[in-house]
């Protein structure tokens, strides 16, 4: 169970991000515990007259949005959403990200790339000097063995993520396996992202380095405040 301070920080970040949404916007809705608070605040703002459409990045988010009464659309209808709100596992000083602990990284990256603005909501624990550790990577099941071998040649220690409350590997909303590739300190995230992406059979990597120019980071604090970077 999370501590109250951490929950206050997440709520503060999510609600601050929801305040950045303007009437009439199409909003990419990320996946995760901090985005949940943004969605709850957006639902409250709808009752105050806000009109929005949401594009969910996972089944979980779509279900939650419907429960909250947030009307949904698709990238087929709205290929260039105004803004996307999402979480992250790590954020460095250059606003480069590691994402994918929730196994929704592929759709999150598609929406992040399409959106005019990307707002990342995190608590202070997610802010790091340098990206490091596990990089979630979605992989076609057919290509699992050669992808694992290729990741090892890049210096990673890849592990197929196992499911919880199910036997066998985690299966993404797209039908892919999730491989957690441990890299240690990532000195050149752009280079590592390109190298992983070029491996045949990789669907998506959790390194997000191409969107720093349109990214704002909302950092929640345990006292219930939030600041925008």
Question: At which residue positions do the language-model features occur?
Answer:
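N-terminal active-site beta-alpha-beta segment that forms phosphate/nucleotide-binding
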Residues: 2-86, 212
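Conserved phosphate- and dinucleotide-binding cores of soluble alpha/beta proteins
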Residues: 2-5, 59-229
């Amino acid at each position: 169970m999370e501590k109250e301070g951490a929950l206050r920080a997440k709520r503060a970040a999510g609600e601050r991000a929801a305040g950045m949404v303007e009437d009439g916007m199409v909003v990419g809705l990320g996946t995760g515990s901090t985005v949940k608070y943004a969605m709850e605040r957006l639902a409250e703002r709808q009752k105050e007259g806000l009109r929005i459409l949401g594009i969910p990045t996972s089944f979980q988010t779509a279900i939650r949005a419907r429960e909250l009464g947030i009307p949904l659309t698709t990238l087929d209808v709205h290929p260039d959403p105004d803004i996307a709100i999402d979480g992250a596992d790590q954020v460095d000083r250059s606003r480069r990200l590691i994402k994918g602990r929730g196994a929704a990284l592929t759709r999150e990256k598609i929406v992040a790339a399409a959106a005019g603005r990307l707002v990342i909501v995190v608590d202070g624990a997610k802010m790091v000097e340098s990206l490091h550790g596990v990089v979630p990577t979605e992989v076609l099941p057919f290509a699992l063995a050669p992808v694992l071998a290729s990741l090892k040649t890049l210096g990673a220690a890849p592990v197929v993520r196992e499911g919880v409350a199910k036997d066998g590997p985690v299966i993404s909303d797209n039908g892919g396996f999730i491989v957690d590739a441990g890299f240690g300190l990532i000195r050149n995230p752009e280079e590592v992202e390109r190298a992983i992406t070029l491996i045949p059979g990789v669907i998506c990597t959790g390194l997000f380095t191409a969107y720093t120019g349109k990214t704002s980071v909302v950092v929640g604090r345990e006292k219930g405040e939030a600041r925008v970077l």
